[in-house]
Amino acid sequence: MILLLQLLLGLGYTALAHLASRWHHDGLALGALVLLIAMVVIEPLLARRPWAFIATPLLAWVAWALYAAGHAALPLLLVPVVFVVAIAWLFARTLRAGSVPLITRIVLGIEGGDGPGALEPDLRRYTRNLTAAWAGVLLLMAGANLLLALIASPAGLLESVGVASPLPITQEQWSLWANLLNYGVIGGFFVVEFAFRKRRFPGRYAGFLDFLRKLAGLGPVFWRDLLR
């Protein structure tokens, strides 16, 4: 239930952030920040963690202060960078010695193996390499997000510190990539990789929808523990 609520808040944030950039509207930017804060603190608040009750009003005050100063849209430039880097880290950290790569854990969850040794060596190598590939793709996306945030005009990161953008793009163009097309790249990579994997390891899935059903069948507890 919490994951669903966070997803809805995330979708609301994406919509408001894009509209705020398109229309240069500080009120919508403030609304996007409020939804972002809610998405981050909702779980710890419901778990009654003391730090969340301290952080929430502080974050709300910072958002309002930025709005009052006319800079509510500035943090929105960095959110896609931080978000994508954080996801890349979820993949990359599992590549350390002694850890089970994230994609390997997902495949083990689907196939019911007790550990990496339960997978065929070829499949085990593939899942490790795929984990590294996801981390690499996401880091490249984060770099693109940061570059576009720097050169956006008006009020991009460079212009916010008094440096003229060498190759200006509009805020709407930045937002189109950072808040919308990012997800298209992720979805495209996901679909293309599945098509390749289905040929590389035939007989494991009846089709793409069957694969999605198996992912959903892992349940919220599996996904919560996977991302911790």
Where are these regions (language model features)?
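Alpha-helical transmembrane segments and their cytosolic membrane-interface
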Residues: 1-35
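Membrane-interface starts of transmembrane alpha-helices
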Residues: 5, 25-28, 75, 177, ...
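Glycine/small-residue-rich interface belts in oligomeric ring/scaffold proteins
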Residues: 23-54
